[in-house]
């Protein structure tokens, strides 16, 4: 059986790596990367971290479409599907790549699997929420990470194609040893720090909110911020890049194993990332999530993850 995996972002590479760890000789795997995260430092670090040979991946030409352009991605993916002729397509998560992959499979009459199906934040204005709903409607098999996800699909009358398979990123987490970042000086860890990531459009496109988030980060003694290309571009665009509080240390995005090391050795995490919420939860780190709601309800119910969406605020009080 020929399986085609369609991915395009860092979190999707992590999910893909988990699936590829369970390779079977019965399956032939092909990979297409849409280049939705187009920075070499972001993509190649992760592929190399998981031992995935870059020569086995078909990278779409990101010059032919905007990173947010589902229609152009769909057209390019449809061309690739006609050449590869897979028996089934695997799509992952909740990005524009997810929707483009699901749509191209559907309109080319190829069965598809949505991994991480059934997750819901119930924030209808959130792009990722729309992507999840569309993908679950389009795909033939819905692989759910939690019982809550299955329950969500039951409410939408989609449970007839839902399967509770567990969280595949937990497999990767358990099998990845945190590694001390190779490009960071040894004295970096002499002082305590909080870890933060910001990349969601609802936070980046609200300029006053973004400025207030940075102001709130200044209430912490020291913050390490791996800077996503979209955040850097936005900060430059709105003239905030040169005014970042001095207690915030910007670093390049890291491979997954090194990111786990940063989380493990931090005082706490402030993020809008779904994946980082879970990694922090598994590493038992106090977490503040910059959202109105989260699809990972279990982290909230545990009391370890707290939603925070009004800024500025004294984050020391929130972490305590």
Model-derived segments and spans:
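Structural motif
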Residues: 2, 87-88, 193, 267-268
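Active-site and donor-binding regions of nucleotide-sugar-utilizing enzymes
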Residues: 4-7, 13-22, 26, 46, ...
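N-terminal glycine-rich anion-binding loop in soluble enzyme alpha/beta folds
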Residues: 24-55
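Donor-nucleotide binding loops and adjacent catalytic segments primarily
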Residues: 36-39, 44-47, 179-265
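A nucleotide-sugar donor-handling region in carbohydrate enzymes
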Residues: 37-41, 60, 138-204, 209
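Leloir-type glycosyltransferase catalytic cores
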Residues: 47, 148, 306-320
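Short acidic-hydrophobic, aromatic-tinged amphipathic segments that line or gate anion-handling sites
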Residues: 57-60, 144, 164, 249-252, ...
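A donor-sugar binding/catalytic signature common to diverse glycosyltransferases
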Residues: 91-92, 114-115, 142, 260-299
